[in-house]
């Protein structure tokens, strides 16, 4: 029986289907693990909402758009600054410079809905706010407008408002209809983001110039500078990133994604949709890529190189970068060999990272989990796990406590909400959603992650955790 | 001079808000109950954003459950979610108190929360047995997100807790109810420290100090489930009906004192945060008045040490420097009064709320300090940003949400309030009371020295 | 790895010293006695430079008298000056204790200080009456400036105080003698706090916490003459012969414990400053051992809060960063051990003394931390400056005397020790004990964030 | 009887002669007040030693010399950084730039004398140290060597050593023989400094260029930038400061003071000696000047202007500066009118400031005192005081307490050692030796001082000093 009902779940036995223990004797090597379903109420999930999925993950990384959240003040407040760490540079594709650096981290607009808006509808207020916002930040290249629970429930028609305002303001005004309650997780928001951008933006603008080596880099959000790492590799290979979706991107880039020669899909959970749609409509093929860990990174650079006939350049990059990191990799492996790890990312990172962490750091992956991963993702986790590894969809805090007890991970890669909880159990935790001292992607990023894992495990605090009643022998006596 | 110039928002839009919605205040309040568990009746974002925020600020876990409303609830109502949510939480966590916190969705859907809670109680009793079920108290807290802000949510929560749980007895307990407001663990510890120096036992309504700043001691921790240490015990909450009086240290938290006063004829006093000398003096006098206890030499010596620090550094380094203060309506007003006590000019005070107590409290500060104060009222950080571009100041005081603005403006930021996530330890350091004032004197002065004196470093030779 | 590389001074010259001469340590020690008055037997500069230094660091008055030796004393000796100085001081200030602190001049002149004190006693008795005169104790403290440094002067003073004043009784007093070393008021308060959490009463030898951090309360102050509040009462000093044991928290202050041990068969322990977790643990264990009192949950919870802070921030922000530490031989060694507990590398530790305990304590740190440490031994700030130009570090930890050097090197300075005059409040913030460690975690982390994270400010978003 | 025995002095009746109460009915208008005598042992003086007088006051302000203190480590440590605040700029008179900014605040050298040196003498060690120092800082233009109590008592011959080292090193090496015990106060050190500089340096070098308007500015140490204020005025008048003695000065400037057309003596206590000697030997006349307070500043700029035929320029400077400060002066006067003040400077500032503080700030000078002032200074204090003012030579702390009680000053201008003592008595105190937010000289400096006095008195802490048991009426009830 590959499924597992944890002791803490005896009152919510539905959870059994979400928790799988890898057993390679399974006929198909994997097993349909339940996922992407609604969380059981009251079970202390780590999941977020659809609004977080679209604004927090997809659109919040764009440098030159203004976000208008149609909501009571709370959603706007929570949408500000982004919960991830998405830096942007002010440089624009046409060589100009956007007037505010990290604009995406600095400003957000909301309609501040109150009781009477709830009663009488908020569409007029929304229009007014969009006008004001446009006046306040006239230099933005587009305005994105977000539905929330409140406006979803009162039934405001955001598309109609945005259409009207786009005509009035002469710049793109785009509605994202992903109210918080939509879908079981933030993944619904990713989905809405993808479709909206495809339907309303892709194909509507032309790039200032194109080359034969233009790519879309899709699902790369520049968390803590991830994109800037990859950018260097592509530059070295002579490949031009025409459009990012959406890390350090401009609004314009989204509009001319149809002009690339190839799409690369980096985060396959949040962004495959848009790549597929672009392929279907515009014939731009896409590759699913993985740049986490030296081997995947090398493999995928090779694949891209091959596609563009840049095999030599790819090899050169790989060689150069590997040489740089090898000594550090060796050091961290010597320190981390055999240490038990639980990777609890949002989704894909749990399977991106499991092999590289085993291979390059010698660590023992004892548990994997995802917050909003879908079936294909769990298949990959299952495939990549060794026998006995526990794989959990949407783990709740009580389950986490039990897993720590039973599997005794020596480190957990997780989110900030769980981090301090694990600490209280005496287990170090490194933030895998937005990193500690990232970036974590690419060759050097993997070393950064290794270092963060290393420092977390070797933090002397863990050894000093409990007061010793007896003076240690080699002490100051 | 000494005018309060109230500048209201002219925009409809809110840009870079400095308030958030009601549920946060309620989640904060319930987190201060020992084995207390907030259950947010809404979408997952409603709890997750707040847990994220608490984790980031306190660097501690924040256990907040959610009923995970989805499309089906939007159509059929949240009955099933709330009842099963309460049931699951009760069975798996065995909390002492569950606080049901509503949101925009559950309020718009129009759920009969009171009715659902009744049903849930029955089901819990069926499952866990009458006795076990009776030990678990459920508090209904209505916090519609589209009305006011987190401070109102806090006020609603404290009132709901008191109204639901208080159990009058025939005798007074000799204690004092204290409503601290949305403050930091360090502040609550300072309140308790002051009370102990006055020989007074307090009932904190509620006490987030330990839950949001807990020791890392796995060997001693509550496990299966893990609970953070501390919080106000249920027994104390029940006993709050029998106290000598109620002091609210947040000008927005006046409903519970009023309710206690009305029901139990208990004297109460509501003020802005006791930040600085005069506000703390006033708090001490109220404690004395309600309890009859003397003001001890010990506490006056602590006061004397702040006065000493102020005498030594305020006129020399701080006098006449202009300050912008933003955030919480109670803390900002307290801070404004205190920076005036330091001889600084609280040039502009910005809050996101629109309540009159903010204006009234600030008028007093303007009068005392003999300075004109601009009050950005019901405003946001963007309004402050625009204001400061035209009217530069020497120092900003407020949360980390103003950090990038401060950096762009070239104005040093002294971090106060919630949230502070770009530096460490601020949650532990009080700003309330005499020791809080001492921290502020040191922190503000060092910020000024860093920025304005290091350029002529010989000046720091003595 | 884990070698201690001792680098001794090659120059004869001292350039930018980090030690000063013995009398300062003695003046500090006597200042910690209630109504205790140091009388420096030397030139006016000997007291004035120190009073200047204390005023600048503590921002408090420091009453230190001087015998004002001049040319005539150089020729005829300082007899008249010392006898009349003691007489005037006694008559006008009515102190409980006068500590006669010698200097280079009085030592070179060869004054018979013991004899002069005897004569002075007779004259005081003549003037004030036998009874009044007997109440005023005189302690002779020999502190030749050309031997060692202020730490030796402190050690000599504590020994002289104990040897002169201690009065054995038949029964133990159940107390613990604590020699804090040359530390700050905040440190001594933290020591007293820890003892109180352990239910132990301490006799501080001596207690400068109140004298060097006194409330400004003219209405309650001792006047005519004004005395700063506090200090160890004479009765306690007399009672120190009857304690359960003596703990010295400064590795250089070992003479008084040895003397007490020898005379009264009292157990003693001498260690480096209890900075950081292991050193504080060790202190707590010694308290337990000497008193038999249990280690309470309260103190372990305070410990757990530091551990929590270290778990949260050390690996994330501090790990692997190189640190240069300079100053006091006991504090630097404690700091080195603590920064290693934070995962940082105490790359270089510099002190002006040449005592072996410094080297031995540091060897232990090197071994524990598995890092090579360079020990600048018997060195000065110039040596550190030259070293750091070749071997840059990420952080400097030490007194304000390194501030201009740090600025020129572009290395942030976290201020610790004596003197700190270019920022405020450091004298009140402990570095000792668990709460001291907590302050240090916060302070060091924020210094690192300021310098190395603000340039990529998005990293501070969570 | 103009002398006064304070109550606290009944055990040291000699003090009566040091304390004078102004009485204009005195035949001569003033009275020989005892001063510049040895302090009574054990009476808690604020005075320093002769070493402090020479290094701390006179020589420590020079930008390009290295100081070698022949002492146990303490004197060297205390001599580091200077107790005053003497900034220097790296610009040199010949247009070059000294390699270290504020060099004078950063480095000091000592011989670190130990027991065996005391027994066997320290002269060889001193030589060795001077050689090392010269090697460590080869760019310095001179080395100044200081005797201290120890070396004074053991009888080391510093002049001999310096002579030898000067020959060996090829740069000026100068001995200053002012051991700590010399003379009753730091004033002895000033004296030694003056004579030594005159005898060993003045006349030994020639300036890079001269003009017809060259002056020596003597006794101006650039405390907190004082000199830089005056420099502007002289520049505006077309007058060239050829040599400063010694604020922001170079060693060379001291050596060519004989080439100026006029010496101005700013601090008349510490530096008149050298001006007199230069006049006697080289015929350079000197003027005693006073730039504290607008009126003295104007008067003395006029006198200098007159000397050089620059009356018009002087008037222009005065007019411009007065216009700038008048509104602020008016404001501070309105705030400080009638407030009682005690001026307790080292010496001259007590008489420099008494009149301007009365005239421009309307304050009531109730007490004056000096630490190391001589007879001529007390004469001036007496002349300038109104009847009833108490004038104290070398006040000790008990006397200070009594004066506060009896004269109730609302502010004391004093030193840092006394500052916090006065605070504890509830009386604000501003540091007059090295200032709080200086400079205090000249027109704008006077306003700075007025502001510091104003902020000190109006510091709200004083009103909040005592806890009120009753809630004030207009409060938050």
UniProtKB/Swiss-Prot annotation, chains A, D:
It comes from Methanococcus maripaludis (strain DSM 14266 / JCM 13030 / NBRC 101832 / S2 / LL). Its cofactor is [8Fe-7S] cluster; [7Fe-Mo-9S-C-homocitryl] cluster. Signal peptide: none annotated. It comes from the Archaea. One of its GO terms (molecular function) is metal ion binding. Pfam families: Oxidored_nitro (PF00148). [8Fe-7S] cluster binds at residues 49, 75, 149. Binds 1 [8Fe-7S] cluster per heterodimer. Binds 1 [7Fe-Mo-9S-C-homocitryl] cluster per subunit. GO terms for biological process: nitrogen fixation. This is Nitrogenase molybdenum-iron protein alpha chain. Disulfide bonds: none annotated. It is an enzyme of class 1 (oxidoreductase). This molybdenum-iron protein is part of the nitrogenase complex that catalyzes the key enzymatic reactions in nitrogen fixation.
Curated annotation (Swiss-Prot), chains B, C:
One of its GO terms (molecular function) is nitrogenase activity. One of its GO terms (biological process) is nitrogen fixation. InterPro entries: ChlB/BchB/BchZ, Nase/OxRdtase_comp1, Nase_comp1_CS. Its EC number is 1.18.6.1. Its cofactor is [8Fe-7S] cluster. It comes from the Archaea. [8Fe-7S] cluster binds at residues 21, 46, 104, 145. Tetramer of two alpha and two beta chains. Forms complex with the iron protein (nitrogenase component 2). This molybdenum-iron protein is part of the nitrogenase complex that catalyzes the key enzymatic reactions in nitrogen fixation. Belongs to the NifD/NifK/NifE/NifN family. This is Nitrogenase molybdenum-iron protein beta chain. It comes from Methanococcus maripaludis (strain DSM 14266 / JCM 13030 / NBRC 101832 / S2 / LL). The gene is nifK.
């Amino acid at each position: 029986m590959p499924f597992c009902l944890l002791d803490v779940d005896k009152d919510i036995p539905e959870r059994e289907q979400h928790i799988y223990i890898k057993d390679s004797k399974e006929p198909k090597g994997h097993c349909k693990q339940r996922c992407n379903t609604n969380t059981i109420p009251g079970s202390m999930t780590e999941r977020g909402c659809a609004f977080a999925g679209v604004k927090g993950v997809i659109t919040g990384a764009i440098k030159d758009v203004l976000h208008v959240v149609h909501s009571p003040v709370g959603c706007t407040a929570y949408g500000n600054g982004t919960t991830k760490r998405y830096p942007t540079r002010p440089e624009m594709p046409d060589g100009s410079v956007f007037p505010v650096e990290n604009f995406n981290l600095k400003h957000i607009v909301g309609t501040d809905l109150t009781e009477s808006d709830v009663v009488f509808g908020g569409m007029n207020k929304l229009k007014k706010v969009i006008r004001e916002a446009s006046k306040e930040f006239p230099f933005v290249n587009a305005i994105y407008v977000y539905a929330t629970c409140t406006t979803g429930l009162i039934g405001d028609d955001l598309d109609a408002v945005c259409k009207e305002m786009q005509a009035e303001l002469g710049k793109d005004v785009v509605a994202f209809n992903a109210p918080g309650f939509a879908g079981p997780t933030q993944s619904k928001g990713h989905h809405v983001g993808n479709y909206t951008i495809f339907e309303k933006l892709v194909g509507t603008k032309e790039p200032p110039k194109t080359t034969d080596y233009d790519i879309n880099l899709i699902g790369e959000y520049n968390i803590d500078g991830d994109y800037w790492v990859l950018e260097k590799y592509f530059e070295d290979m002579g490949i031009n990133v025409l459009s990012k979706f959406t890390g350090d991107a401009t609004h314009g880039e989204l509009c001319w994604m149809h002009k690339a020669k190839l799409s690369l899909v980096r985060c396959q959970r949040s962004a495959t949709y848009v790549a597929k749609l672009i392929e279907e409509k515009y014939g731009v093929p896409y590759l699913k890529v993985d740049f986490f860990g030296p081997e995947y990174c090398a493999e995928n650079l090779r694949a891209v190189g091959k596609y563009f006939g840049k095999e030599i350049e790819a090899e050169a990059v790989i060689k150069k970068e590997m040489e740089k990191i090898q000594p550090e990799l060796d050091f961290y492996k010597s320190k981390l060999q055999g240490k038990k790890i639980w990777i609890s990312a949002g989704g894909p990172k749990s399977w991106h990272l499991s092999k590289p962490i085993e291979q390059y750091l010698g660590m023992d992956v004892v548990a994997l989990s995802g917050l909003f991963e879908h079936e294909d993702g769990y298949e990959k986790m299952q495939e990549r796990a060794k026998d006995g590894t526990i794989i959990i969809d949407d783990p709740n805090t009580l389950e986490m406590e039990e897993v720590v007890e039973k599997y005794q991970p020596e480190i957990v890669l997780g989110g900030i909400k769980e981090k301090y909880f694990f600490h209280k159990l005496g287990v170090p935790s490194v933030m895998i959603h937005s990193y500690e001292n990232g970036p974590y992607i690419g060759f050097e990023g993997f070393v950064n992650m290794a270092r963060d894992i290393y420092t977390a495990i070797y933090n002397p605090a863990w050894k000093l955790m409990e007061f010793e009643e007896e003076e240690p022998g080699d002490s100051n006596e | 001079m000494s005018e309060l110039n109230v500048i209201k928002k002219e925009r409809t839009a809110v840009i870079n808000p400095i308030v958030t919605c009601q549920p946060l205040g309620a989640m904060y309040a319930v987190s201060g109950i020992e084995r207390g568990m907030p259950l947010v009746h809404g979408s997952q974002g409603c709890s997750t954003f707040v847990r994220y925020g608490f984790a980031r600020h306190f660097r501690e876990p924040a256990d907040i459950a959610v009923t995970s409303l989805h499309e089906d609830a939007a159509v059929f109502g949240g009955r099933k979610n709330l009842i099963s949510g309460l049931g699951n939480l009760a069975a798996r966590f065995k909390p002492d108190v569950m606080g049901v916190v509503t949101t925009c969705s559950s309020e718009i859907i129009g759920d009969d929360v009171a009715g659902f809670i009744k049903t849930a109680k029955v089901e819990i009793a069926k499952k866990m047995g009458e006795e076990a079920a009776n030990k678990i108290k459920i508090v209904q807290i209505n916090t519609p997100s589209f009305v006011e802000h987190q401070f109102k949510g806090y006020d609603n929560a404290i009132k709901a807790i008191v109204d639901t749980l208080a159990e009058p007895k025939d005798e007074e307990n000799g204690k004092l109810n204290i409503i601290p407001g949305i403050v930091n663990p360090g502040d609550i510890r300072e309140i308790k420290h002051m009370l102990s120096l006055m020989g007074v036992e307090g009932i904190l309504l509620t006490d987030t100090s330990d839950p949001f700043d807990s020791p890392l001691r796995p060997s001693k921790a509550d496990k299966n489930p893990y609970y953070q240490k501390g919080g106000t015990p249920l027994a104390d909450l029940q006993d709050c009906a029998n106290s000598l009086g109620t002091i609210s240290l947040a000008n927005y938290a006046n409903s519970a004192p009023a309710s206690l006063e009305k029901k139990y004829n208990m004297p109460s006093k509501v003020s802005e945060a006791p930040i600085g000398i005069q506000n703390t003096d006033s708090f001490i006098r109220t404690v004395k008045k309600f309890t009859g206890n003397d003001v001890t030499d010990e506490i006056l010596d602590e006061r004397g040490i702040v006065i000493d620090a102020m005498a030594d550094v305020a006129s020399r380094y701080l006098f006449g420097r202009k300050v912008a203060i933003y955030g919480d309506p109670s803390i900002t007003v307290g801070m404004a009064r205190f920076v005036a006590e330091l001889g600084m000019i609280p040039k502009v005070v910005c809050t996101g709320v629109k309540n009159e107590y903010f204006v009234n409290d600030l008028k007093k500060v303007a009068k005392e300090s003999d300075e004109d104060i601009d009050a950005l009222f019901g405003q946001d950080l963007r309004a402050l940003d625009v204001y400061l571009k035209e009217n530069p100041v020497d120092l900003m005081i407020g949360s980390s949400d103003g950090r990038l603005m401060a950096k762009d403006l070239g104005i040093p930021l002294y971090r106060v309030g919630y949230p502070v996530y770009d530096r460490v330890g601020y949650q532990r350091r009080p700003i309330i009371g005499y020791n809080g004032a001492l921290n502020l004197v040191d922190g503000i002065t060092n910020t000024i020295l860093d920025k304005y004196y290091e350029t002529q470093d010989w000046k720091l030779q003595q």
